[in-house]
Each structure stands twice: as C-alpha cells, then as structure tokens.
Amino acid sequence: MRGERGQAIVEFALLLPLLLVVILGVVFVAELGVARLALEHAAAEAARTGSLTNDDDLVRSTAAAAVKPLDASLVKVIIEPTQNEAPRVSAPRGSLLRVRLRYAIPVPLGFVGLPRLTIEGVAVRRVEWTP
C-alpha cells in the first residue's frame, strides 16, 4: 500500500498533456467553424452590395464590416470580374458577380512549424444595376 501513494499524481501528470492537446484541438476546430461561418456571411453581404452597386471599394468595406469576429486586415477580398472588366463595364445586368474571401488562420502550436490554414468563403449574385 505504501508504494501506491503517488500513483494517482503520476497518472494525472502523464495524462494532463494529452488532455490539454485534445482540448486545444476542440477549441481550434470550433474556431475554424466560426471563421468559416463569418466568411460565408461576409461574402454574401459583399456580393449583395456588389450586385446593387458598381463600386469595388464599397464591396471591400462591406466585407470588412461583416467579418466581425475575425481580423479584417487579414481577410483577402477577391472580386470577379473586377469593376473595370467586362461584363461589369458594358452590359452588367444579369451577369454574375463572385466575391471570394480568404483568411489565413494561425494554427495553435505554430512554433512546431505548422503552416497557417486558409479558410475561404464564396458568394455569387446576379448583378441588378444598369449603367
């Protein structure tokens, strides 16, 4: 009986790092889900703005405002086609506008050498405005 006094502490010390890594993984997966939802929502809002106006700067500012839980400075906004490309220049009504948002999310334990993961949100809308 005397040799088993510290057994529980030793078992706890051995399992604690594994438990912490599992908890960190669960939190990271939840963070990925939040980032994906935020990007999808922001892309939809930005595409809606782009379908009603012909202003890429307004589309970018709408995306930056809608991507609230994320750092807007790390979100890359890609608009296809751009403001000065066909069909948005000549006959835009009815053509498609695609807004793609990319966010490089840092991985916990990055010091191990793991790369950042890129999360993407995409939305497509028909252009409604006429020149």
Labelled PLM ranges:
Residues 1-64:
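Alpha-helical assembly-interface signal, strongest on the long, hydrophobic N-terminal helix that forms
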Residues 52-131:
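Short, conserved structural patches
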